[in-house]
Amino acid sequence: MFELKTVALFVITALAEIIGCYLPYLWLNQNKSPLLLIPAAISLALFAWLLTLHPSAAGRVYAAYGGVYIFVAIFWLWVVDDIIPSNWDFLGASVALLGMAIIMFAPRST
């Protein structure tokens, strides 16, 4: 159960970060409303707060979180940007998730 909660927290954190960066992108590159900066700032603040909830040493959390971020970003590419990821994208995201699992869930003496 710990593992499921950890991965779910990583996914929610990644979504908060991606949304917080995607909304300013829409404003800057697609001429959307500057009001998008308000939910973007809220989303990035949520992202920073969520990072404090992760149950391990900060460096380990950031390294493992990177693997989940890669997976969520590829999923975002597919669902939001409507671009079908390549097999290489899926392979890379799978390798990143494997790395995350090793970093977060490997047995440790301390």
Swiss-Prot record:
Keywords for the protein's UniProt record, in alphabetical order: Cell inner membrane, Cell membrane, Membrane, Transmembrane, Transmembrane helix
Transmembrane portions of the chain: 7-27, 33-53, 61-81, 83-103
Record InterPro entries: UPF0060
Coiled-coil portions: none
Gene Ontology cellular component annotations, sorted alphabetically: plasma membrane
Pfam families cross-referenced by the UniProt entry: UPF0060
Record's bilayer topology term: Multi-pass membrane protein
Subcellular locations according to the entry: Cell inner membrane
SUPFAM superfamilies, sorted: Multidrug resistance efflux transporter EmrE (SSF103481)
Signal peptide start-end: none
HAMAP family for this protein: UPF0060
Family recorded in the similarity comment: Belongs to the UPF0060 family.
Protein name per its UniProtKB record: UPF0060 membrane protein Mfla_2554
